[in-house]
Design a protein with these regions (language model features):
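Short, glycine-/small- and polar/acidic-enriched structural segments
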Residues: 29-177, 183-187, 202-208, 221-224, ...
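Conserved C-terminal helix/tail region of periplasmic/extracytoplasmic solute-binding proteins
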Residues: 315-345
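Secondary-structure end/capping motifs
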Residues: 244-321
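Short, solvent-exposed loop/beta-turn-alpha elements that line the ligand-binding surface or hinge
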Residues: 75, 117, 227, 296-303, ...
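Pocket-lining segment of extracytoplasmic ligand-binding domains
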Residues: 107, 179, 183-184, 188-277
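Bacterial lipoprotein signal-peptidase II cleavage site
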Residues: 18-33
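Sec-dependent bacterial lipoprotein signal peptides
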Residues: 1-19
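Solvent-exposed, polar/charged alpha-helical surfaces in well-ordered, non-transmembrane soluble domains
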Residues: 65, 70-71, 93, 97, ...
Length: 345
């Protein structure tokens, strides 16, 4: 498993031509033996507008600004219109209300949203674009020297988020029974720091800048995602309408994402500089996030298994009542046409 975390969808407005789908872009693709998108180019000069929602500061945000700056989206016939959101799940809401064409969603949030809106989740996952293992368990070393020491001690979590899942897996690994589990619900990094300083909490999962703040308050890294055999994955999602009426545009978008990922992998320092220039995120932070991330573009059985494992836990935890088949909310037709090896055959 490797590192990081996730953008997704298109609406009926596109079918009506509101976003410019009337300007058809002719596209020819040449599949390279190694699966590279280097030769995937747009031959016609016209572009089509795509309204993309990104998670501010997320890897999908990086992909959008770097791909635009390098002219990659333009090359593939896309005039990318990017809107930032506080979380990936907000991009899904914006797609539903017709504000966006494509957005993103991370694994846990996606499983939960689908589970709670099964009949109304009018969208499809079109590909995984990143996987990461950057989260870690931070503990007060004076209180926790072994996982079993977590019994009866405060464990911070943000209810309804991925941290609930990580906490559950931690307790399972430690063999701590339910009556010895002491969850402390928080709603922000600042709140977490407060309960850490007061001693109410001795452990919590965190990543990135939030993890650094915990370290500044004396917490130490104790357990990694690799130790639990888990990762954070994120996916692009598109509306059923765009997939049905403008699959070629979805192909263009995915081709541009693939080429952008390859460029970032080959030029991580320059990519971090672009991110800083276009978003204000410090270059060293952007570089660290890129280094901690595995960029890819696929959706295979391992993605299904990953989402199913989260879904099984969520159903057991009562996060939603009705089970579902994740494959009913996936459409890899466009991805498979571009990169056959990226999907399950």
């Amino acid at each position: 498993m490797k590192k990081r975390m996730l953008g997704l969808l298109l609406t009926a407005a596109l079918v009506l031509g509101v976003t410019g789908c009337g300007n058809t872009t002719e596209k020819k693709t040449t599949e390279q033996a190694n699966g590279s998108s280097e030769e995937l180019t747009t031959e016609a000069g016209e572009t089509q507008n795509v309204r993309l929602g990104v998670w501010t500061g997320g890897i999908d945000h990086y992909l959008a600004v770097v791909g635009t700056e390098q002219g990659i989206f333009q090359k593939h016939g896309i005039d990318l219109e990017t809107t930032e959101f506080a979380s990936g799940i907000n991009t899904i809401d914006a797609i539903v209300t017709g504000q966006l064409d494509i957005g993103m969603i991370a694994d846990f949030a996606g499983v939960n949203r689908i589970g709670n809106t099964q009949d109304n989740f009018d969208s499809k996952i079109i590909g995984r674009y990143v996987t990461a293992t950057g989260w870690a368990l931070y503990v007060n070393e004076d209180e926790v020297k072994d996982l079993s020491d977590l019994a009866g001690k405060g464990f911070g979590t943000i209810p309804g988020t991925i941290t609930d899942y990580y906490v559950a897996l931690t307790y399972e690994k430690a063999g701590i029974a339910a009556d010895e589990q002491k969850l402390v619900n928080i709603d922000s990094t600042q709140a977490m720091l407060g309960v850490v300083d007061s001693g109410e909490v001795v452990a919590g999962w965190s990543s990135g800048a939030s993890a650094k703040k915990l370290e500044e308050h004396g917490m130490k890294k104790f357990l990694t995602m690799d130790d639990l055999g888990i990762s954070v994955d994120a996916y692009y999602v598109a509306s059923k309408d765009i997939l049905a009426e403008h699959e070629d545009l979805v192909e263009d978008f995915l081709a541009a994402i693939k080429e952008t990922e390859e460029w970032i992998i080959a030029n991580p320092d320059e990519a971090a500089g672009i991110v800083e220039d276009k978003t204000g995120i410090p270059k060293d932070q952007a570089a660290a996030n890129i280094e901690a991330t595995t960029l890819l573009l696929d959706f295979k059985q391992d993605s299904v298994d990953h989402l199913d494992a989260i879904k099984e836990w969520a159903v057991g935890a009562g996060m939603f009542e009705k089970d579902y088949d994740i494959k009913d909310y996936v459409d890899t037709t466009a991805l498979g046409k571009l990169f056959p090896d990226a999907v399950e055959n």
